[in-house]
Swiss-Prot record:
Any GO molecular function: metal ion binding
Binding site for Mg(2+): 190, 276, 278-279
Keyword Metal-binding in annotation: yes
Name used for this protein in its record: Jasmonate O-methyltransferase
Gene behind the chain: JMT
Known pathway: Lipid metabolism; oxylipin biosynthesis
Amino acid sequence: MEVMRILHMNKGNGETSYAKNSIVQSNIISLGRRVMDEALKKLMIRNSEILSFGIADLGCSSGPNSLLSISNIVETIQNLCHDLDRPVPELSLSLNDLPSNDFNYIFASLPEFYDRVKKRDNNYESLGFEHGSGGPCFVSAVPGSFYGRLFPRRSLHFVHSSSSLHWLSQVPCGEVNKKDGVVITADLDNRGKIYLSKTSPKSAHKVYALQFQTDFSVFLRSRSEELVPGGRMVLSFLGRSSPDPTTEESCYQWELLAQALMSLAKEGIIEEENIDAFNAPYYAASPEELKMAIEKEGSFSIDRLEISPVDWEGGSISDDSYDIVRFKPEALASGRRVAKTIRAVVEPMLEPTFGQKVMDELFERYAKLVGEYVYVSSPRYTIVIVSLLRMG
């Protein structure tokens, strides 16, 4: 599976598009807002004389959320500058995602974004910016994988990423051996599943964890080159609170999708061997795994590390004993909404293996499975939010 080509959300504005089914990701951005605002305040106080800030949002995707993060960042900086009685610095805002992302949707949304910036900035016209421009904000798109360098050395002051770092750079390979100096890899043995599960072999657990450590270390090393000393980074993504990578919070949405696929295979609609060959380029990391990677890379210190549970529709959960009693029709309706959210994200990576023609039937079955599960359980995701300081 070529992740660079297939890892993008459903494009456009249709009923199965990411633009219409991304409330969970929007809520995750909101969940990390407090930590982001705190990091920006510390950054602004330390850099009171800087006239221009480099800011990047990594994994921006497309749709209404694509400009939400940088809009929040600009709003926070404007408010901080007002409180600190200083002019708003020029802001170089870079939006990053893979080349397959629908950047045209983002470009079409920029005039509305610029208008919001203008309304919030009383100094807009006095700075010499014309109507229709971005004012002190200069927005650009940077296509490419964030598992590698994207920006010039020491050109960034702040990096943000939400709902992206749970995606891996590639599907993990099987056990790696050396024979006569040649590295040999095998396909991952995870039959009947598309991600880690209770029945996955321990070797699958190992290679998934290793792939995350490799990818996240490359991510940190790349950002350490691009951020100025004292720069900050706030990351939020799907993770887990348990050391066990096969708990419900980290994998059960994939387990139910595998069940839906297997039901199609049993009826001869798709080939079971295609299910055996498919594994999601995804990993829900634990806080301990994050700490290990950050400490090993050595360029960043952890300013804050939090985990927050949300339900499968993105709603906040404030109580550890969270439990909702649902009527059956309500649970099935919830299942349909969850299925549309998942479809908007994973359909582009499923189509090359299973074909476009089966997608409607697949996600109808998936919606029913999710609804039945929601009826008897209260499933949740765990959101990891980490704020990092570039040392030096």
